[in-house]
């Protein structure tokens, strides 16, 4: 069993919890995911099974989220899972004020990851240090790209909430956006809900709940996604049999393609052969997978 799954991660499980369950159900140790979701977050989690795990690093990095930001409340995790640091409410806050500050969160921005995150510092993950009560030195900011940030809805009240859709680069922390927006407004804010609606070609409307994947395996109907779809953002290069034979031996072959990487296929059989680095008129094998 090899290929990709478009998993709809439920709330309450870590991404690793989902992978562990799939390993038990599918009887396959080589299973990985294409982008961590926090335990409270839900939505698209791309999963690779078998040798497809070698292709995870080539998945499209674009992500789309639907997030709900709650104002007037701050926590140490920057979401509702953490301890409350400030609770003053923000009943006077209106959407007009919020929209003025949202512009600063579009385009290329700098953000500091949450204290509770998987970022490594001093050889350990930040969340491990935070849970042990270790004093964390200044966390280095990261540059991320916010391609689009759209207001979907506004809910006034003592703790007003803003629902937004964000298209962003990989490595973007939506919790940091919520926290920093609250800081800019002077009200404090935290992330109340997060749903990932897209990760590269994997869309929420085509995703499967974990229970459905488990039931499908029992029935022999697990809908695996092939590399043509999973790597659709990469150019496809088709090799004639003589060049395909050289490729399968790990040899560089002549060829042109756009971008840094390309899917490689054999012309006659339409077999997927792997992924190449595109280098000035030649294709350098990076991953050779002749029968995926």
Curated annotation (Swiss-Prot):
**Active site: which residues?**
38
Q: Its Gene Ontology molecular function terms?
A: pseudouridine synthase activity; RNA binding; tRNA pseudouridine(55) synthase activity
InterPro entries xrefs = PsdUridine_synth_cat_dom_sf, PsdUridine_synth_N, tRNA_psdUridine_synth_TruB, tRNA_sdUridine_synth_fam1_C, TruB_C
* Keywords from the UniProt entry: Isomerase, tRNA processing
What is the top EC class of this enzyme, as a single word?
Answer: isomerase
Q: Which transformation does this protein catalyse, written as a reaction?
A: uridine(55) in tRNA = pseudouridine(55) in tRNA
Q: Looking at the record's lineage, which domain of life comes first?
A: Bacteria
Cite the Gene3D superfamilies for this sequence. Pseudouridine synthase
The EC number(s) this enzyme carries: 5.4.99.25
Give the GO terms filed under biological process for this record: mRNA pseudouridine synthesis; tRNA modification; tRNA pseudouridine synthesis
Instruction: List the Pfam families.
Output: TruB-C_2 (PF09157), TruB_C_2 (PF16198), TruB_N (PF01509)
Q: Where does the signal peptide begin and end? A: none
Q: List, alphabetically, the SUPFAM superfamilies matched.
A: Pseudouridine synthase
Coiled coil start-end: none
What task does this protein carry out? Responsible for synthesis of pseudouridine from uracil-55 in the psi GC loop of transfer RNAs.
Q: Which HAMAP family match?
A: TruB_bact (MF_01080)
Instruction: Identify its protein family.
Output: Belongs to the pseudouridine synthase TruB family. Type 1 subfamily.
Q: What is this protein called?
A: tRNA pseudouridine synthase B
Q: Which organism is it from?
A: Gloeobacter violaceus (strain ATCC 29082 / PCC 7421)
Gene for this chain? truB
């Amino acid at each position: 069993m090899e290929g990709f799954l478009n998993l709809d991660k439920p709330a309450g499980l870590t991404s690793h919890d989902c992978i562990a369950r799939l390993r038990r159900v599918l009887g396959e140790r080589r299973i990985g995911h294409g982008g961590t979701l926090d335990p409270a977050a839900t939505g698209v989690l791309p999963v690779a099974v078998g040798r497809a795990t070698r292709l995870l690093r080539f998945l499209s990095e674009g992500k789309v989220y639907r997030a709900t930001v709650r104002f007037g409340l701050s926590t140490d995790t920057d979401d509702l899972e953490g301890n409350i640091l400030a609770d003053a409410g923000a009943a006077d806050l209106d959407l007009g004020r919020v929209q003025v500050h949202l512009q600063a969160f579009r385009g290329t921005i700098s953000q500091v990851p949450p204290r509770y995150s998987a970022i490594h510092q001093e050889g350990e993950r930040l969340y491990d240090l935070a849970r042990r009560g270790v004093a964390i030195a200044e966390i280095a900011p990261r540059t991320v790209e916010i391609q689009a940030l759209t207001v979907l809805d506004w809910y006034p009240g003592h703790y007003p909430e803003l629902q937004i859709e964000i298209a962003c680069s990989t490595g973007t922390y939506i919790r940091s956006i919520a926290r920093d927006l609250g800081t800019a407004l002077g009200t404090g804010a935290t992330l109340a809900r997060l749903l990932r609606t897209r990760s590269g070609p994997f869309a929420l409307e085509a995703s499967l709940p974990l229970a459905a994947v488990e039931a499908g395996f029992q029935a022999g109907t697990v809908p695996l996604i092939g590399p043509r779809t999973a790597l659709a953002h990469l150019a496809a290069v088709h090799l004639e049999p003589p060049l395909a034979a050289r490729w399968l031996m790990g040899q560089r072959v002549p060829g042109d393609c756009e971008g840094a990487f390309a899917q490689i296929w054999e012309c006659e059989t339409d077999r997927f052969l792997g992924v190449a680095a595109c280098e000035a008129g030649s294709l350098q094998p990076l991953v050779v997978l002749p029968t995926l």
